[in-house]
UniProtKB/Swiss-Prot annotation:
Record lineage: Bacteria, Pseudomonadati, Pseudomonadota, Gammaproteobacteria, Pseudomonadales
Organism (species): Pseudomonas fluorescens (strain ATCC BAA-477 / NRRL B-23932 / Pf-5)
Protein name as catalogued: Spermidine/putrescine import ATP-binding protein PotA
ABC transporter domain residues: 12-250
Entry binding sites for ATP: G48, P49, S50, G51, C52, G53, K54, T55
Gene: potA
A Pfam family it matches: ABC_tran
Amino acid sequence: MNALHALQTLAVSIRSVRKVYGDPHSGPVALKNIDLDIRDNEFFTLLGPSGCGKTTLLRMIAGFEFPTQGEILLYGENIADRPPFERPVNTVFQHYALFPHMTLAENLAFGLESRPMGQVLSKAQIDERVREMLALVQMERFAARKPNQLSGGQQQRIALARALAPHPKVLLLDEPLSALDLKLRQAMREELKAIQAKTGITFIFVTHDQEEALTLSDRIAVLSEGEVQQVGRPEEIYEQPRNRFVADFIGETNFIPAMVSRVEAGLAWFSGPAGQALPAQPCTTAKVGQQVTLSVRPERLHLRGDASQGALACRIEALIYLGTDLQYQVSLGDGTRLTVRTPNSLEHHPRLSVGSSAGLLFERGSASVLLD
């Protein structure tokens, strides 16, 4: 692939973008030299806690804010200094901002009727596009209704359809599901992903909800304190976190302090805080004698009735019933406490009682070796 073709397959490229409010030398820094590539037709998520800079970055792509330094490329063209109306992007906000005095069809038509000179559509073209968008979000029979006659999920669909109607090259979504209840939010995730696949438009989605990010995304960028911590596919982010922040922010995990005792053929062996041998894990960067932290997801640990056949001896300290799962708190001989999650299946996972002794097994390759 030549350089020109590679550039053309990128929808958005963020190059050394920095955002400082107030004095550029002493003001608060919202973004610190961000570099990101977002591919054409990709569902890309900016994920992080409140204040991490994800919404600021989205607003700069939209043109609502401008970077202190750096470039924002849209299909290879720098748009960092352009106002919003000169950017072929649209935004769906957390609050849908539908016009209450207009019908749904009129809401969708409004943006099409307000196009700049040279891009004006005929009445027939606008009506056809409105019908297409209502069909896309399965709201054709509600065309004559007004927003206050809709549920929250229906309003969200119309806001999405209105943003897609002008054929944007990139659609920006700023936590659009956060106002919905859990069941509706889960249903809308499936619809969002299906609509993105059907339209082929690049979606850039902002959320603090890890489950949303893992469910929807082709790739995720995890942000913290104005910096990108890791970019990757959902399974990479979850199973191979680059640092302690990513491991802790995405899902649940156990952190185990350990020392590298042996490295051989791409595997590393470890000893725990009290010197107990811990299972080997794939690792090519650790060195013998190095202090590291192992991150192990609760579902990658398994309990058995005794500590035979390589299992570590442990004690059941607590049991929490979660419906589909059982969550155990266990302690090792040195006092290290770990969380173990097993399916709620009496046939395959006999329930262990609090206070009893048990054996703890690590899945091979289950631990991420964190060097920070």
